[in-house]
Protein backbone atom coordinates (compact mmCIF):
# COMPACT_ATOMS: atom_id res chain seq x y z
CA UNK A 1 0.00 0.00 0.00
CA UNK A 2 1.34 3.42 -0.97
CA UNK A 3 2.17 5.51 2.06
CA UNK A 4 0.79 9.04 2.11
CA UNK A 5 3.65 11.56 2.26
CA UNK A 6 3.92 13.41 5.53
CA UNK A 7 2.90 17.03 5.70
CA UNK A 8 5.58 19.66 6.03
CA UNK A 9 6.02 21.22 9.42
CA UNK A 10 4.87 24.81 9.75
CA UNK A 11 8.44 26.07 9.38
CA UNK A 12 9.15 23.79 6.42
CA UNK A 13 5.96 24.90 4.71
CA UNK A 14 6.78 28.55 5.32
CA UNK A 15 10.26 28.02 3.87
CA UNK A 16 8.81 26.28 0.81
CA UNK A 17 6.62 29.34 0.25
CA UNK A 18 9.57 31.69 0.67
CA UNK A 19 11.63 29.59 -1.74
CA UNK A 20 9.12 30.43 -4.48
CA UNK A 21 10.60 33.92 -4.41
CA UNK A 22 13.27 32.76 -6.85
CA UNK A 23 10.56 32.92 -9.54
CA UNK A 24 9.30 36.39 -8.64
CA UNK A 25 9.09 38.83 -11.53
CA UNK A 26 11.84 40.99 -10.04
CA UNK A 27 14.13 38.59 -11.93
CA UNK A 28 12.33 38.96 -15.27
CA UNK A 29 14.59 40.55 -17.92
CA UNK A 30 12.09 43.38 -18.45
CA UNK A 31 12.20 44.34 -14.79
CA UNK A 32 15.98 43.94 -14.68
CA UNK A 33 16.17 46.26 -17.69
CA UNK A 34 14.13 48.90 -15.87
CA UNK A 35 16.14 48.49 -12.67
CA UNK A 36 19.46 48.86 -14.48
CA UNK A 37 18.38 52.07 -16.19
CA UNK A 38 18.34 50.53 -19.66
CA UNK A 39 14.64 51.06 -20.39
CA UNK A 40 13.43 53.77 -22.76
CA UNK A 41 10.72 56.21 -21.80
CA UNK A 42 8.31 54.33 -24.06
CA UNK A 43 9.09 51.05 -22.29
CA UNK A 44 8.56 52.63 -18.86
CA UNK A 45 5.29 54.16 -20.04
CA UNK A 46 4.13 50.84 -21.47
CA UNK A 47 4.83 49.09 -18.19
CA UNK A 48 2.95 51.73 -16.19
CA UNK A 49 -0.04 51.73 -18.56
CA UNK A 50 -0.31 47.94 -18.63
CA UNK A 51 0.29 47.48 -14.93
CA UNK A 52 -2.62 49.86 -14.32
CA UNK A 53 -4.95 47.11 -15.50
CA UNK A 54 -3.50 44.84 -12.82
CA UNK A 55 -3.86 47.56 -10.18
CA UNK A 56 -7.54 48.25 -10.85
CA UNK A 57 -8.40 44.55 -10.78
CA UNK A 58 -6.79 43.83 -7.41
CA UNK A 59 -9.83 45.19 -5.51
CA UNK A 60 -12.09 42.95 -7.63
CA UNK A 61 -9.92 39.98 -6.66
CA UNK A 62 -10.14 40.95 -3.00
CA UNK A 63 -13.90 41.48 -3.24
CA UNK A 64 -14.23 37.96 -4.64
CA UNK A 65 -12.26 36.54 -1.73
CA UNK A 66 -14.49 38.33 0.77
CA UNK A 67 -17.66 37.28 -1.06
CA UNK A 68 -16.62 33.64 -0.68
CA UNK A 69 -15.47 34.00 2.93
CA UNK A 70 -17.99 33.30 5.74
CA UNK A 71 -15.55 34.39 8.46
CA UNK A 72 -16.37 37.90 9.64
CA UNK A 73 -13.00 38.43 11.33
CA UNK A 74 -11.12 37.57 8.16
CA UNK A 75 -13.31 39.92 6.13
CA UNK A 76 -12.76 42.72 8.63
CA UNK A 77 -9.02 42.50 8.03
CA UNK A 78 -9.10 41.67 4.33
CA UNK A 79 -11.23 44.69 3.43
CA UNK A 80 -8.26 46.95 4.22
CA UNK A 81 -6.65 45.73 1.00
CA UNK A 82 -9.56 47.08 -1.01
CA UNK A 83 -9.41 50.38 0.84
CA UNK A 84 -5.68 50.62 0.14
CA UNK A 85 -6.25 50.24 -3.59
CA UNK A 86 -9.59 52.00 -4.09
CA UNK A 87 -9.27 54.52 -1.27
CA UNK A 88 -12.11 55.92 0.81
CA UNK A 89 -14.20 58.47 -1.08
CA UNK A 90 -13.15 61.03 -2.14
CA UNK A 91 -9.58 59.76 -1.73
CA UNK A 92 -8.53 57.61 -4.69
CA UNK A 93 -6.13 55.33 -2.81
CA UNK A 94 -3.60 53.25 -4.70
CA UNK A 95 -5.41 53.71 -8.00
CA UNK A 96 -5.01 57.47 -7.81
CA UNK A 97 -1.37 57.09 -6.75
CA UNK A 98 -0.78 54.93 -9.82
CA UNK A 99 -2.34 57.55 -12.07
CA UNK A 100 0.06 60.10 -10.58
CA UNK A 101 2.88 57.73 -11.52
CA UNK A 102 1.46 57.59 -15.04
CA UNK A 103 1.51 61.38 -15.26
CA UNK A 104 5.02 61.44 -13.81
CA UNK A 105 6.31 59.25 -16.65
CA UNK A 106 4.64 61.40 -19.29
CA UNK A 107 1.29 59.70 -19.86
CA UNK A 108 -2.10 61.35 -19.58
CA UNK A 109 -4.47 59.86 -17.05
CA UNK A 110 -7.18 59.76 -19.71
CA UNK A 111 -5.06 57.53 -21.93
CA UNK A 112 -4.25 55.17 -19.07
CA UNK A 113 -7.85 54.98 -17.84
CA UNK A 114 -9.03 54.23 -21.37
CA UNK A 115 -6.90 51.05 -21.29
CA UNK A 116 -6.01 51.56 -24.95
CA UNK A 117 -2.41 50.54 -24.27
CA UNK A 118 -3.29 47.35 -22.39
CA UNK A 119 -1.96 44.37 -24.34
CA UNK A 120 -4.19 41.30 -24.78
CA UNK A 121 -1.62 39.10 -23.05
CA UNK A 122 -1.66 41.37 -20.01
CA UNK A 123 -5.44 41.49 -19.97
CA UNK A 124 -5.74 37.70 -20.21
CA UNK A 125 -3.25 37.16 -17.38
CA UNK A 126 -4.97 39.61 -15.04
CA UNK A 127 -8.44 38.33 -15.89
CA UNK A 128 -7.29 34.79 -15.15
CA UNK A 129 -6.28 35.91 -11.66
CA UNK A 130 -9.62 37.57 -10.92
CA UNK A 131 -11.55 34.58 -12.27
CA UNK A 132 -9.47 32.24 -10.13
CA UNK A 133 -10.34 34.26 -7.03
CA UNK A 134 -14.03 34.03 -7.89
CA UNK A 135 -14.00 30.28 -8.46
CA UNK A 136 -11.53 29.06 -5.83
CA UNK A 137 -12.18 28.66 -2.14
CA UNK A 138 -11.49 31.83 -0.19
CA UNK A 139 -8.55 30.18 1.55
CA UNK A 140 -6.93 29.19 -1.74
CA UNK A 141 -7.51 32.62 -3.26
CA UNK A 142 -6.14 34.30 -0.15
CA UNK A 143 -2.99 32.19 -0.30
CA UNK A 144 -2.33 33.34 -3.87
CA UNK A 145 -1.70 36.81 -2.45
CA UNK A 146 1.53 35.63 -0.85
CA UNK A 147 3.61 36.95 -3.72
CA UNK A 148 3.38 40.02 -1.46
CA UNK A 149 6.14 38.34 0.54
CA UNK A 150 8.53 39.47 -2.16
CA UNK A 151 6.89 42.82 -3.00
CA UNK A 152 8.75 45.12 -0.58
CA UNK A 153 12.02 44.21 -2.29
CA UNK A 154 10.69 45.09 -5.74
CA UNK A 155 9.19 48.39 -4.57
CA UNK A 156 12.41 49.31 -2.77
CA UNK A 157 14.46 48.48 -5.86
CA UNK A 158 12.39 50.95 -7.90
CA UNK A 159 12.74 53.66 -5.27
CA UNK A 160 16.50 53.17 -5.20
CA UNK A 161 17.20 52.89 -8.92
CA UNK A 162 14.59 54.85 -10.84
CA UNK A 163 15.41 58.36 -9.52
CA UNK A 164 19.05 57.73 -10.39
CA UNK A 165 18.46 56.35 -13.88
CA UNK A 166 15.34 58.24 -14.91
CA UNK A 167 15.65 61.83 -13.61
CA UNK A 168 12.86 62.88 -15.97
CA UNK A 169 10.30 61.07 -13.77
CA UNK A 170 8.63 63.48 -11.34
CA UNK A 171 9.23 62.45 -7.72
CA UNK A 172 5.52 62.63 -6.89
CA UNK A 173 5.07 59.53 -9.02
CA UNK A 174 6.86 57.34 -6.49
CA UNK A 175 4.23 57.61 -3.75
CA UNK A 176 2.61 54.31 -4.68
CA UNK A 177 5.86 52.40 -4.20
CA UNK A 178 6.50 54.14 -0.87
CA UNK A 179 3.05 53.32 0.47
CA UNK A 180 3.27 49.67 -0.50
CA UNK A 181 6.43 49.10 1.53
CA UNK A 182 4.42 49.04 4.76
CA UNK A 183 1.10 47.88 3.33
CA UNK A 184 2.60 44.79 1.71
CA UNK A 185 4.32 43.73 4.93
CA UNK A 186 1.05 44.04 6.86
CA UNK A 187 -0.85 42.09 4.20
CA UNK A 188 1.75 39.32 4.24
CA UNK A 189 1.34 38.71 7.96
CA UNK A 190 -2.40 38.18 7.58
CA UNK A 191 -2.17 36.10 4.41
CA UNK A 192 0.62 33.93 5.78
CA UNK A 193 -1.31 33.19 8.97
CA UNK A 194 -4.35 32.10 6.96
CA UNK A 195 -2.21 29.93 4.70
CA UNK A 196 -0.19 28.18 7.39
CA UNK A 197 -3.36 27.46 9.38
CA UNK A 198 -5.41 26.30 6.39
CA UNK A 199 -3.13 23.90 4.51
CA UNK A 200 -1.98 21.22 6.90
CA UNK A 201 -1.80 17.99 4.87
CA UNK A 202 0.81 17.11 2.25
CA UNK A 203 -1.76 17.25 -0.55
CA UNK A 204 -3.13 20.61 0.60
CA UNK A 205 0.33 22.11 0.95
CA UNK A 206 1.43 20.99 -2.50
CA UNK A 207 -1.75 22.41 -4.01
CA UNK A 208 -1.15 25.72 -2.28
CA UNK A 209 2.40 25.86 -3.65
CA UNK A 210 0.98 25.27 -7.14
CA UNK A 211 -1.48 28.12 -6.56
CA UNK A 212 1.40 30.39 -5.59
CA UNK A 213 3.24 29.31 -8.74
CA UNK A 214 0.09 30.16 -10.74
CA UNK A 215 0.23 33.70 -9.36
CA UNK A 216 3.94 33.92 -10.17
CA UNK A 217 3.13 32.73 -13.69
CA UNK A 218 0.64 35.59 -14.05
CA UNK A 219 3.15 38.24 -13.00
CA UNK A 220 5.84 36.76 -15.28
CA UNK A 221 3.44 36.51 -18.22
CA UNK A 222 2.58 40.20 -17.94
CA UNK A 223 6.23 41.06 -18.48
CA UNK A 224 6.53 38.49 -21.27
CA UNK A 225 3.78 40.33 -23.16
CA UNK A 226 5.52 43.67 -22.62
CA UNK A 227 8.85 42.23 -23.75
CA UNK A 228 7.38 40.91 -26.97
CA UNK A 229 5.70 44.23 -27.79
CA UNK A 230 8.24 46.78 -26.55
CA UNK A 231 11.62 45.03 -26.66
CA UNK A 232 11.22 42.81 -29.71
CA UNK A 233 8.72 45.17 -31.39
CA UNK A 234 6.30 42.31 -31.95
CA UNK A 235 3.03 43.61 -30.58
CA UNK A 236 -0.12 41.66 -31.49
CA UNK A 237 -0.75 41.71 -35.25
CA UNK A 238 2.63 43.36 -35.88
CA UNK A 239 3.04 41.33 -39.06
CA UNK A 240 -0.07 42.84 -40.63
CA UNK A 241 -0.47 46.30 -39.08
CA UNK A 242 1.18 48.80 -36.75
CA UNK A 243 -2.19 49.88 -35.37
CA UNK A 244 -3.48 48.75 -31.98
CA UNK A 245 -6.37 46.77 -33.36
CA UNK A 246 -6.74 44.42 -30.40
CA UNK A 247 -9.94 44.50 -28.31
CA UNK A 248 -10.34 47.19 -25.70
CA UNK A 249 -12.86 47.96 -22.99
CA UNK A 250 -15.26 45.10 -23.65
CA UNK A 251 -15.92 44.39 -19.99
CA UNK A 252 -16.01 47.84 -18.40
Swiss-Prot record:
One Pfam family here: TENA_THI-4
Q: In which pathway does it act?
A: Cofactor biosynthesis; pyrroloquinoline quinone biosynthesis
Q: What is the uppermost EC class here?
A: oxidoreductase
Single GO term (MF): pyrroloquinoline-quinone synthase activity
Keywords for this protein:
Oxidoreductase, PQQ biosynthesis
Tell me which EC number(s) this protein carries: 1.3.3.11
A biological process term (GO) from this entry: sulfur compound metabolic process
- Reaction catalysed by this enzyme: 6-(2-amino-2-carboxyethyl)-7,8-dioxo-1,2,3,4,7,8-hexahydroquinoline-2,4-dicarboxylate + 3 O2 = pyrroloquinoline quinone + 2 H2O2 + 2 H2O + H(+)
Q: Which family does it belong to?
A: Belongs to the PqqC family.
Tell me the function of this protein.
Ring cyclization and eight-electron oxidation of 3a-(2-amino-2-carboxyethyl)-4,5-dioxo-4,5,6,7,8,9-hexahydroquinoline-7,9-dicarboxylic-acid to PQQ.
- Do you know which HAMAP family this protein is assigned to? PQQ_syn_PqqC
Annotated protein name in UniProt: Pyrroloquinoline-quinone synthase
Q: Which organism is it from?
A: Acinetobacter baumannii (strain ACICU)
Amino acid sequence: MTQTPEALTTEQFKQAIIDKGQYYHIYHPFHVMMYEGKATQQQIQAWVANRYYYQINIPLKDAAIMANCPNQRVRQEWIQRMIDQDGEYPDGGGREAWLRLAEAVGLSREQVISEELVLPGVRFAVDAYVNFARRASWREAASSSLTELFAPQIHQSRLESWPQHYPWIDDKGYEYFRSRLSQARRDVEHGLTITLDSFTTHEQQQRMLEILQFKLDILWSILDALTLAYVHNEAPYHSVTQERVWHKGLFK
